[in-house]
Amino acid sequence: MFRRFLLLAPLALLPLTTFAAAPLKALILTGQNNHDWKLTTPLLEKALTDTGLFTVDVAVSPPKGADMSAFRPAFSDYAVVVSNYTGDAWPADTKSAFVAYTRRGGGFVVVHSASNAFPDWPEYNAICGLGGWEGRDERWGPWVYWDKKIIRDPSPGRGGDHAPVHSFVIDVREPNHPITRDLPPAFLHAADELYNRLRGPAENLTVLATAYDKPFGAGSGRHEPILLTVTYGEGRVFHTTLGHVRGDPTAMRSVAFIATFQRGAEWAATGKVTQPVPSDFPDASALRLR
């Protein structure tokens, strides 16, 4: 009996060893940004690895104004690409490889100002859905905001603005989406830029969550998109407007940012979210930082 047990024991372990899911490969693009990319990139990397789902590589571009011809990340090696990049244009073959990767089913995550990059690259604007600044106006597409439903407003005007940094409540608009499923209907985020007046093609776009932008400073007085998804070909895109960091990393220490970023990255990579909502996720009355 004992000898038979020894023979069967390795077979009993097979489901654990042979069929354990391989980690998802994630790539963070960075190296140029109008925010502190040397501070934010490790925070994004930690958020991904803390899930236990991802291994992470980082592709750092040449500095602004330098020769970009050798910047050619191997997008197709990864389940998801995270952009923490706002800077010089990529080489033509890198742009083509990125579009092909996304169209064929690659996952893409847009963090904060990454959606403001490449205003003259139509495919990138379509992939992000919305963007701002860099000369964007009604030619790039409508403003998108929430007024009991998604509003696509073609009125003329600049794309992209924000009031001074402040804390705000985020309202879930699509509670049945895998990213937002089981989240509180409203939750408090740390001091951050609340982007407003974003515009773009807004095709195949779903707004998952919004925040009311109080009409002070450059505030719009409207409910602005905060978390959104875009379908581009077979690719899944998660776009978070959160994550303003210039010296003070509070916005990326917010559990509201961390958990939605983690869930969005998993969804972009796989189409599913297996992570439970963390026990320290905030409601609308209590801020949570890590």
Where are each of the predicted segments found?
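Helical hinge/lid and interdomain linker segments adjacent to catalytic or ligand-binding clefts
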Residues: 21, 25-32, 36-118
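Catalytic beta-strand/loop cores that center a nucleophilic Ser/Cys/Thr
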Residues: 49, 55-57, 77, 146-236
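Bacterial N-terminal signal peptides
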Residues: 8-17
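Extracellular ligand-binding/catalytic regions of CAZymes and related secreted enzymes
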Residues: 21-24, 39, 50, 73, ...
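A glycine-rich, often tryptophan-bearing local segment used as a flexible ligand/cofactor-contacting loop or short
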Residues: 29, 88-178
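Bacterial N-terminal signal peptides that target proteins for export
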Residues: 1-9
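Short, solvent-exposed loop/turn segments at secondary-structure junctions
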Residues: 33-34, 88, 115-117, 185, ...
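Structural detector of well-ordered beta-strand residues that form the stable sheet scaffold
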Residues: 105-109, 208, 238
